[in-house]
C-alpha cells in the first residue's frame, strides 16, 4: 500500500464498511492519495457497518475518518431505514435487476455525495471516491453513470473550487467491474475483507447470508476463486 506524504493530494472516500467502499479506499491509497474517509449514520438498520468502517480506515492507513449523522429514517421509504419493510431474501440476480428494490434509500447517494463535497471543500481535497459498480446501477438510480456525471457537473457550479477553475472529480473506480472483479482487485491491494460487512439485515452482528448484498458477495468470492472470510448466519 502506498504511503501518503505531506505533499500528497487529498481525496475524500465514502466508506460504509462494506466490500465495495473498502476496495475504493484501497484504490485511493494505492494511488498515493491522502485519503480522508467519511461514513454516514443515516438511520440504517445495519449500523454494525460503521464500526467496521472505523477498523478498515485504520487498517488501510486513512489520514482521517469522520462519521456524520443524517437521519434518513425520519422519512422511511426503504427496507434499510424502516423496520416495517422486510429486507428481500433469497432472490436471484436476475430478479434483483428487474426493478428498483425496496432496499433503495431515497436520495441517499445524493445526500452522501453532498456531505463528501462539503468535507472535500473544507480540507482541500481534489477527488471524491464512491464505490458504486456495475451490479448496483442495474437497480439503483443513484448508482448510475448518468447520476455521477450530473453530480460532478453540479459540483463544478456549486462550489468555490469549481467556480475558481479547480473542480472536484467524482471517482468511481469500480463502476465497470463485476463483484468478482472487485474481489480480485481488492485482494491484490490487500483489502482486509474479513473486517467488512455487506449485509442488509445482520443477525447478532453476523451477515445473514440470504439478502441481496450477501448473495452477491458470496457469488463474487466464488467467481473470483478467492476464499470468502465472511461468517454467515445461514
Curated annotation (Swiss-Prot):
Gene3D superfamilies: HUPs. Its EC number is 6.3.4.20. Pfam families: QueC. Pathway: Purine metabolism; 7-cyano-7-deazaguanine biosynthesis. The keyword Membrane does not apply. The keyword Zinc applies. This is 7-cyano-7-deazaguanine synthase. Zn(2+) binds at residues 199, 208, 211, 214. The gene is queC. SUPFAM superfamilies: Adenine nucleotide alpha hydrolases-like (SSF52402). Keywords: ATP-binding, Ligase, Metal-binding, Nucleotide-binding, Queuosine biosynthesis, Zinc. It catalyses: 7-carboxy-7-deazaguanine + NH4(+) + ATP = 7-cyano-7-deazaguanine + ADP + phosphate + H2O + H(+). It comes from Anaeromyxobacter dehalogenans (strain 2CP-C). Belongs to the QueC family. Its cofactor is Zn(2+). One of its GO terms (molecular function) is zinc ion binding. Binds 1 zinc ion per subunit.
